[in-house]
Each structure stands twice: as C-alpha cells, then as structure tokens.
Amino acid sequence: MKCQKRLSYLFRKFALIKNFKGSANMSGKRIIISRTDGIGDVILALPMAGVLKKIYPDCKVIFLGRNYTKPIIETCANIDEFFAWDEIEKLDERESIKNLANLNADIILHVFPRRAVAELAKKAGIPFRVGTSSRAFHWSTCNRLIRLSRRKSTHHEAQLNLKILVSLGGKKKYTLNEIPEYFGFTKVKPLADPIRNLLDEKRFNLLVHPLSKGSAREWGIENFQELLKILPKDKFKIFISGTEEEGIMVRPLLVDKYPEVIDMSGKLSLDELISFISHMDGVLAASTGPLHIAAALGRYALGLYAPMRPIHPGRWAPIGKKAEYLVKDKYCSKCKKKNRCECIESITPAEVKGQILKMLP
C-alpha cells in the first residue's frame, strides 16, 4: 500500500513537472482544439477559442471535430479553420499522419481525450501536445500535461475546458457570468423566408425539444403534454424540434393532440436549426444540443435537469446571459442504472410554466 501511494505521488509530481512553466507565447501560432464528441460538448469548448483570440489576437485556431458538428464550429467567429476527424480516421495511418501534419499546427489541446487522436498528433510531429495527466495514454503521447480531473470536479464543463489554457496565459478560473462573452457564436446564416414566416411577432415563440436521443435524462412526454395544455395560447406560439425518428414518437402525443403546435422535427438541417433558434424567444429542453445552442446565441434557454452527478446542472447547465435551469434540490442516484429519472419528472408543468412566464415582456 505504501509503495502504491509513493508511486501515485511520483506520478502526480511528474505530471506537474511536465506541465507548462509560466505562459508560453502562442502569438502567431496555429493551435488545434480537439473535441470530437457531441454538439453540447463542442459548444462548451468554444469559449477556449475566444480566450485564445483575446490573449493572442493573431493566433490561428483550428477545431478538430466531427462533420456533424461542423455547422456549430463554423458559426463561431473565433475559429479560423475546421478539420474533420471523420475524414482522418477513414485513411490509413500514413495518410492520416500526412493530413494532420499538413495543418502545420504548433500546438494541439486534447480537450476530449481520445487515444487515436493523441497518438496521431505525436506521429504528425506537432511540437506541443497538451493533455490531462489523468489519462495514462497522454503520458506517452503528450509533452505537456495538465493536472485536471473532471470526474469529481465541482466546476462546470466550460470552466474545466478553460483550465487547459492556464499555462497559455488564461486565468485559473473564469466565472459562469463572464464565459458567455467568449462564445463568439455570431456567424449565423440567414433564415429562409418560408421558415421565418412561421414566426409570430405578437407572441412568444417557444421551441420545445422534448427528447434527447438518450444523451440526457428526459422530462417525459406526459409533462410536455400538460405544459402545452396550460401555456396561454394567446401569449405563446409553440414549435417542436427533434430528429425525424423523434418526430415519429412525439407527433401523436404533442402535435396531433395540439394542432396549434408547429412540428419542425426532422425538417431542419443543423445550420437551419441554429438560424431558427436565433429567431426564437426561448428554448425549453433537457441537457441537449439545442439548449446549449440557444444559450450561446444569447436567447432565453430553460434547461430541465436531474440532480445526479455527473449529469447535474453544476456540470452541464446552459451558459448564457438568458440561460436558466430547473432541478430538484436533492441528492439522488436512483437513475444511475436506468434512463428514466423520477427527479426530473417530478418537476411540475406548473413550475416550468411559471419560470417561462417570467420571460414575457
């Protein structure tokens, strides 16, 4: 046991030694932010680009992500280039190395730890490769290690991402109130007239995103049904969003039953969804991509959350000037091994209605 503790101590000490000492000058450098997961995850990594641009205005920020998140990344004014991981992983090793090396990057930040990306970055000869010391494969693939553990952290995901920039001149902690200024989520494409014409200038246009494709605990269709029933129709125009598959599930219960509701599920590309949300007065959803899109755009975003760690709002709440969330103030882990969550379902439609009504002019 003593030997294990000693090895653990040396392991951590070495991690700190390998960490940056002082602020590295990245002015004029090409910096890759690697985050190859979902929409919400990518959005919460965008402030990293904003911070880098503030510290080093002439640096070039390249985002390594997946093709399906490309519209998110291209909406960010602080990102200069997008590079698709999907295309790289299709190639053989030699071509993959060549393609990554051709970016002429000076540094790569492994925000979402992925062994294949880390190994490729080393083989491509990227000079500075930054990863967290908590991932064993980073010890052999990175030459700069950051002491950062997300599992038990009390910080928000966006704050944890920004901690990776401390050794590049970033602050040790950014408050949730100051992070929105770094999103740069402003390059929104124009909304097509047929879609724009669906909006009501006299009512509150509310986008409801009831499902999550299993990525989050859900409020429940029954709760959404009751909410649609009690929201005043003279004050709200309701839109439903989701994939086509989700639309098949919710139409009989939320659209056919309430003919005044406009069904947008399966009808919008991600580019169009971003534009559409930018014209919404508010978005209601669980911890999903559309919720984080709304928050980053500065629209009213109301998230419905489970209190269980690590999916609680302390880690994944929407961040924005008009972002809010509802969660039961209790500790519970009953849904740890199942998708249905009693806590989030116990948030009443009346509570949600009351919160939304506060946003009316």
PLM feature spans:
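Generic beta-sheet signal
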Residues: 85, 111, 132, 241, ...
